[in-house]
UniProtKB/Swiss-Prot annotation:
This is Molybdenum import ATP-binding protein ModC. Residues 293-366 form the Mop domain. Its main location: membrane. InterPro entries: AAA+_ATPase, ABC_transporter-like_ATP-bd, ABC_transporter-like_CS, Mo/tungstate-bd_C_term_dom, ModC_ABC_ATP-bd, Molybdenum_import_ModC, Mop_domain, P-loop_NTPase.
């Protein structure tokens, strides 16, 4: 199966509240929003773990909503892994394999996914004889992903799969999830962690009290000041980039990004490697003329397009901060400034300015 489109229309009433959503996505579709927004309910309905009042579910041209859960071929990974404690790792994996229908694994391309390949990719081959109670949190999640994959799913539904892991364990698993996405396995991914969204998402669905506030590509959602204000202090644009070269004598790597060059601390990546970068709005300085001697490496010509008030959690009343959208040749940045700065600098749509960014402020999300 190719990286197929996902279509969801869902309505369900709970006592005192209602979830009513309609969205479509490509590749990895991330459901993002605060607690109580309806993310997990949507994931459970798609996976067939609850029966909503109304559901339309289409994955890769296949209508799945009329099928019972066991025939939808949807692999599910939860926050707490939910492995069978009385079975070994091998027993848990074999449980997933027994649920797989006959036929080819649905992934496309030259990405082999036999049982052995899955275990190698997830790094769980040495764990087969162990019981879940003896595994670390990261090991349990890798086994849970392997069990889901061995069921030969049409897609994966992942509900906060990394929420209980420390940062090091997250960094072990995120590249595996990106490889699965690149291999063509559609995902519905629930999270409230911006880094996970930035690393994995193709499309993002912003949820708020059971409704879709906005949906679209990661690049659009992350660089729209009207939407990114909801990310609070973590607002920032996510951009696709390619390693174009290195300057080891200066400790820098050159990235081709959004039609311009961005310098970051030296990366151990080959030229031509594709990756993503996240540039926090709080780390972007807006200038109307080029500064003199300065430690900043990145001085990028941009065009101011629009701005919105920055709604920050924990700040009451009218905020005096704003998110300004800045156009690059092939994308957009966000900058957090004060309203006073907008007036002082005469920032208005169409104004040519400079975006100043420290190289160490660019969050390189990896290949």
């Amino acid at each position: 199966m190719s990286s197929a489109a996902l279509e969801v229309r869902l309505n369900h009433r709970f006592p005192g509240t209602e979830i009513d959503v309609c969205f479509a996505g490509r590749g990895c579709t991330v459901l993002f929003g605060p607690s109580g927004a309806g993310k997990s309910t949507i994931a459970m309905a798609v996976a067939g773990l609850m029966r909503p009042d109304h559901l339309h579910l289409r994955v890769g041209g296949l209508d799945l909503h009329d099928l019972p859960p066991e025939r939808r071929r949807i692999g599910v990974v939860f926050q707490d892994a939910r492995l069978f404690p009385h079975l070994s790792v091998l027993g848990n994996l074999e449980y997933g394999a027994r649920r797989a229908p006959p036929g080819d694994f649905p992934l496309s391309g030259d990405f082999p996914l036999s049982r052995e390949e899955i275990m190698t990719m997830l790094g769980i081959g040495a764990l087969l004889k162990r019981r879940p109670a003896t595994l670390s949190g990261g090991e349990r999640q890798r086994v849970a992903i392997g069990r889901a994959l061995l069921s030969r799913p049409h897609m994966l539904v992942m509900d906060e799969p990394l929420a209980s892991l420390d940062q090091a364990r997250k960094q072990d698993i995120l590249p595996v999830l990106r490889r699965l996405k690149a291999a063509g396995l559609p995902m519905l991914y629930v999270t409230h962690a911006l880094q996970e969204m930035a690393y994995l998402a193709d499309d993002v669905v912003l949820l708020e009290t059971g409704r879709v506030r906005a949906s679209g590509s990661l690049g659009h959602i992350s660089s729209d000041p009207a939407l990114s204000g909801g990310f609070g202090h973590e607002a920032g644009a996510v951009l696709e980039a390619v390693v174009s070269g290195h300057m080891p004598d200066r400790g820098l790597t050159i990235l081709s990004c959004a039609g311009t060059e961005v310098l970051v601390p030296l990366q151990a990546l080959k030229p031509g490697t594709g990756l993503r970068v996240r540039i926090p709005a709080a780390d972007v300085i807006v200038a109307t003329e080029s500064p003199g001697h300065i430690s900043l490496h990145n001085i990028l010509p941009v065009v101011m397009t629009d701005w919105q008030p920055a709604h920050l959690q924990g700040k009451a009343g009218t905020t005096q901060e704003a998110l300004v959208r800045l156009a690059l040749p092939g994308g957009h940045l966000l900058a957090r400034v004060t309203r006073d700065a907008i007036q002082r600098l005469g920032l208005e749509p169409g104004r040519h300015v400079l975006a100043l960014i420290k190289s160490v402020a660019v969050d390189v999300l990896g290949p």
